[in-house]
Amino acid sequence: MMKLCVVLAASILSSMASAQTATAVAYSPDQLLQLAQQMREQAKNSKEAGTGILEKHLDSATILAFRDRDGKAELHQQFGDVFVVLQGTATLVTGGTIASPTTTAPGEIRGASIEQGIRKKLQEGDIAHISAGVPHQLILDAGGTFTYFVVKIPLK
Protein backbone atom coordinates (compact mmCIF):
# COMPACT_ATOMS: atom_id res chain seq x y z
CA MET A 1 0.00 0.00 0.00
CA MET A 2 2.80 2.43 0.89
CA LYS A 3 4.50 1.78 -2.45
CA LEU A 4 1.21 2.53 -4.22
CA CYS A 5 0.89 5.80 -2.28
CA VAL A 6 4.44 6.80 -3.19
CA VAL A 7 3.82 6.03 -6.87
CA LEU A 8 0.52 7.93 -6.78
CA ALA A 9 2.14 10.91 -5.09
CA ALA A 10 5.04 10.92 -7.54
CA SER A 11 2.71 10.84 -10.52
CA ILE A 12 0.53 13.64 -9.17
CA LEU A 13 3.44 15.81 -8.10
CA SER A 14 5.21 15.26 -11.43
CA SER A 15 2.49 17.43 -12.95
CA MET A 16 4.48 20.36 -11.54
CA ALA A 17 6.57 20.28 -14.71
CA SER A 18 3.72 19.51 -17.08
CA ALA A 19 1.98 21.94 -19.39
CA GLN A 20 -1.36 23.43 -18.48
CA THR A 21 -4.26 21.26 -19.51
CA ALA A 22 -8.02 21.48 -19.88
CA THR A 23 -9.20 18.78 -17.52
CA ALA A 24 -11.43 17.85 -14.62
CA VAL A 25 -9.92 16.25 -11.52
CA ALA A 26 -11.46 15.03 -8.27
CA TYR A 27 -9.68 14.20 -5.01
CA SER A 28 -11.05 12.69 -1.84
CA PRO A 29 -9.94 14.14 1.50
CA ASP A 30 -8.31 10.77 2.28
CA GLN A 31 -6.23 10.91 -0.93
CA LEU A 32 -5.06 14.42 -0.12
CA LEU A 33 -4.21 13.54 3.48
CA GLN A 34 -2.12 10.57 2.27
CA LEU A 35 -0.19 12.90 -0.01
CA ALA A 36 0.18 15.37 2.85
CA GLN A 37 2.21 12.80 4.78
CA GLN A 38 4.99 13.36 2.26
CA MET A 39 4.60 17.10 2.71
CA ARG A 40 5.43 16.60 6.41
CA GLU A 41 8.90 15.39 5.44
CA GLN A 42 9.33 18.28 3.00
CA ALA A 43 8.32 20.77 5.71
CA LYS A 44 10.78 19.27 8.22
CA ASN A 45 13.64 19.98 5.80
CA SER A 46 12.47 23.47 4.83
CA LYS A 47 11.96 26.89 6.32
CA GLU A 48 8.50 26.99 4.75
CA ALA A 49 5.49 24.73 4.37
CA GLY A 50 5.63 21.43 2.55
CA THR A 51 3.80 22.07 -0.72
CA GLY A 52 3.20 20.46 -4.07
CA ILE A 53 1.35 21.55 -7.19
CA LEU A 54 -1.27 18.92 -7.93
CA GLU A 55 -2.54 20.23 -11.28
CA LYS A 56 -2.02 23.20 -13.57
CA HIS A 57 -5.18 23.97 -15.51
CA LEU A 58 -5.82 26.54 -18.22
CA ASP A 59 -7.66 28.76 -15.74
CA SER A 60 -6.24 27.78 -12.33
CA ALA A 61 -3.83 25.59 -10.39
CA THR A 62 -4.30 23.35 -7.36
CA ILE A 63 -1.79 22.98 -4.54
CA LEU A 64 -1.61 20.80 -1.45
CA ALA A 65 0.13 22.34 1.57
CA PHE A 66 1.18 21.08 5.00
CA ARG A 67 2.35 23.56 7.65
CA ASP A 68 4.04 22.89 10.95
CA ARG A 69 4.88 26.55 11.53
CA ASP A 70 3.43 29.98 10.77
CA GLY A 71 3.46 31.23 7.22
CA LYS A 72 4.93 34.52 6.14
CA ALA A 73 2.63 37.38 5.32
CA GLU A 74 2.02 37.31 1.58
CA LEU A 75 0.21 39.12 -1.19
CA HIS A 76 -0.37 37.89 -4.74
CA GLN A 77 -1.14 40.74 -7.14
CA GLN A 78 -2.23 38.46 -10.00
CA PHE A 79 -3.82 35.48 -8.18
CA GLY A 80 -6.65 34.86 -5.75
CA ASP A 81 -6.54 31.90 -3.36
CA VAL A 82 -9.23 29.52 -2.17
CA PHE A 83 -8.22 27.43 0.87
CA VAL A 84 -10.04 24.22 1.80
CA VAL A 85 -8.98 23.08 5.27
CA LEU A 86 -8.34 19.33 5.44
CA GLN A 87 -6.83 18.96 8.92
CA GLY A 88 -5.79 21.10 11.87
CA THR A 89 -6.57 24.66 12.93
CA ALA A 90 -4.96 28.00 12.17
CA THR A 91 -5.77 31.68 12.28
CA LEU A 92 -6.04 33.39 8.90
CA VAL A 93 -5.05 37.06 9.09
CA THR A 94 -6.23 39.16 6.12
CA GLY A 95 -6.15 42.79 5.07
CA GLY A 96 -4.04 45.32 6.89
CA THR A 97 -0.46 46.05 5.93
CA ILE A 98 2.49 43.69 5.41
CA ALA A 99 5.36 44.53 7.78
CA SER A 100 8.77 44.80 6.09
CA PRO A 101 7.47 43.87 2.61
CA THR A 102 9.82 42.35 0.05
CA THR A 103 9.03 41.57 -3.59
CA THR A 104 10.07 37.94 -4.09
CA ALA A 105 8.89 37.56 -7.70
CA PRO A 106 6.84 39.68 -10.09
CA GLY A 107 3.51 40.34 -8.38
CA GLU A 108 4.52 38.42 -5.22
CA ILE A 109 5.18 40.22 -1.93
CA ARG A 110 6.22 38.62 1.37
CA GLY A 111 6.81 39.99 4.84
CA ALA A 112 7.24 39.09 8.49
CA SER A 113 3.65 39.72 9.59
CA ILE A 114 0.45 41.66 8.98
CA GLU A 115 -0.34 44.79 10.95
CA GLN A 116 -3.98 45.78 11.57
CA GLY A 117 -5.38 42.64 9.89
CA ILE A 118 -8.63 40.79 10.52
CA ARG A 119 -8.24 37.42 12.27
CA LYS A 120 -10.43 34.40 11.49
CA LYS A 121 -10.01 30.94 13.03
CA LEU A 122 -10.01 28.14 10.41
CA GLN A 123 -10.66 24.45 11.10
CA GLU A 124 -11.30 21.23 9.20
CA GLY A 125 -13.99 21.70 6.54
CA ASP A 126 -13.71 25.50 6.37
CA ILE A 127 -13.26 27.26 3.04
CA ALA A 128 -11.60 30.68 2.75
CA HIS A 129 -11.44 32.91 -0.34
CA ILE A 130 -8.69 35.53 -0.55
CA SER A 131 -8.93 37.93 -3.49
CA ALA A 132 -5.87 38.97 -5.48
CA GLY A 133 -4.13 41.92 -3.82
CA VAL A 134 -5.24 41.06 -0.27
CA PRO A 135 -2.45 40.52 2.28
CA HIS A 136 -2.84 37.23 4.15
CA GLN A 137 -0.99 35.03 6.64
CA LEU A 138 -1.63 31.73 8.42
CA ILE A 139 -0.77 31.59 12.13
CA LEU A 140 -0.77 28.09 13.66
CA ASP A 141 -1.78 27.13 17.16
CA ALA A 142 1.27 26.38 19.33
CA GLY A 143 2.58 22.92 18.43
CA GLY A 144 -0.14 22.41 15.82
CA THR A 145 -0.12 21.44 12.17
CA PHE A 146 -2.35 22.56 9.31
CA THR A 147 -3.10 20.79 6.03
CA TYR A 148 -5.01 22.55 3.27
CA PHE A 149 -5.90 22.38 -0.42
CA VAL A 150 -5.39 25.60 -2.40
CA VAL A 151 -6.95 26.71 -5.67
CA LYS A 152 -4.95 29.51 -7.32
CA ILE A 153 -7.19 31.66 -9.51
CA PRO A 154 -5.50 34.12 -11.88
CA LEU A 155 -6.95 37.55 -12.58
CA LYS A 156 -8.32 37.82 -16.08
Task: Please report, for each region that a protein language model flagged, where it lies by residue.
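His/acidic/aromatic-lined binding-pocket segments of jelly-roll/cupin-type domains
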Residues: 74, 81-84, 119-120, 127-128
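A short, N-terminal "cap"/entry segment at the start of jelly-roll beta-barrel domains
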Residues: 17-77
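Bacterial N-terminal signal peptides
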Residues: 3-16
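Short, conserved beta-strand element in jelly-roll/cupin
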Residues: 77-98, 104-113
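Short, surface-exposed beta-strand-loop junctions and turns on beta-sheet-rich folds
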Residues: 98-100, 144-145
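Conserved metal-binding segment of the jelly-roll/cupin
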Residues: 121-141
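A short hydrophobic beta-strand segment most commonly corresponding to one strand
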Residues: 143-156
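Short hydrophobic/aromatic-rich beta-strand segments that constitute the beta-sheet cores
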Residues: 64, 92-94, 148
